Swiss-Prot record:
InterPro entries: NAD(P)H_OxRDtase_bac/plastid (IPR023043), NADH_UbQ/plastoQ_OxRdtase_su3 (IPR000440), NDAH_ubi_oxred_su3_sf (IPR038430). Its main location: membrane. This is NADH-quinone oxidoreductase subunit A. It comes from the Bacteria. Its EC number is 7.1.1.-. The gene is nuoA. It is an enzyme of class 7 (translocase). It is found in: Cell inner membrane. It is a multi-pass membrane protein. It comes from Polaromonas naphthalenivorans (strain CJ2). Gene3D superfamilies: NADH:ubiquinone/plastoquinone oxidoreductase, chain 3 (1.20.58.1610). The chain crosses the membrane at residues 7-27, 63-83, 88-108. Keywords: Cell inner membrane, Cell membrane, Membrane, NAD, Quinone, Translocase, Transmembrane, Transmembrane helix, Transport, Ubiquinone. NDH-1 is composed of 14 different subunits. Subunits NuoA, H, J, K, L, M, N constitute the membrane sector of the complex.
Length: 119
């Protein structure tokens, strides 16, 4: 086995790691170091930092996040299906239609239950 073939890959990895680490090292070595309480305090979009990091969130945020992930995964399943639609034939087409039907029924159920209402 000839290891000379892997030299470009090794060089590519070394250059990539160097590009990632070199700016951090240069910033640490060349940057000014004058810490004070103002610089060390957390900054949150122009507002004063909250006292407690454990803020209570409304459950609807989590519900929207879960629904987003669910329908995002649906798109992830539909893309390979659309690419290979010619090869999979009628059985593949109808199996995806059943999959979409189940998702549509779930979406209508969520809509009727008020999961998408923000009031």
């Amino acid at each position: 086995m000839n290891l000379d073939q892997y030299l470009p890959v090794l060089l590519f990895i070394l250059v990539g790691v160097g590009v990632g680490i070199l700016p951090m090292v240069l910033g640490r070595l060349l940057g000014p170091v004058r810490p004070d309480s103002e610089k060390n305090s957390p900054y949150e979009c122009g507002f004063e930092a909250f006292e407690d990091a454990r803020m209570k969130f409304d459950v609807r945020y989590y519900l929207v996040a879960i629904l987003f992930i669910l329908f995002d995964l649906e798109i992830a399943f539909l893309f390979p299906w659309a690419v290979s639609l010619k090869e999979i034939g009628a059985l593949g087409f109808w199996s995806v239609m059943v999959f979409l039907g189940i998702l549509v029924v779930g979406f209508v159920y969520e809509w009727k239950k008020g999961a998408l209402d923000w009031e």
